[in-house]
């Protein structure tokens, strides 16, 4: 059952705001991974490639951390993750 914003407590509204921010951050991390991967394909310098590969791994860690936070704040989303993982 969905609720209108008028029926939500300040705490529920704050959680929704936090979730919106976290989801936007998640999008940013995924876009960064894609961008670094594209750059790797264009780079010729091996040190630069290695550095970007390392950065991609860090970005993937950020994705995992954000997904965990989102699941903690959104039980319905957590349930969806459980169904597909």
Per-range role (PLM):
Residues 1-85:
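Iron-associated oxidoreductase/ferritin-like identity signal
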């Amino acid at each position: 059952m969905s609720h209108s914003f008028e029926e939500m407590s300040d705490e529920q509204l704050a959680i929704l705001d936090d979730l919106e921010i976290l989801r936007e951050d998640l999008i940013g991390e995924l876009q960064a991974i894609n961008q670094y991967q594209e750059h790797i394909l264009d780079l010729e310098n091996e040190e630069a490639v290695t550095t970007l590969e390392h950065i991609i791994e860090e970005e993937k860690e950020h994705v995992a951390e954000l997904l965990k936070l989102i699941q903690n704040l959104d039980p319905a989303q957590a349930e969806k993750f459980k169904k597909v993982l």
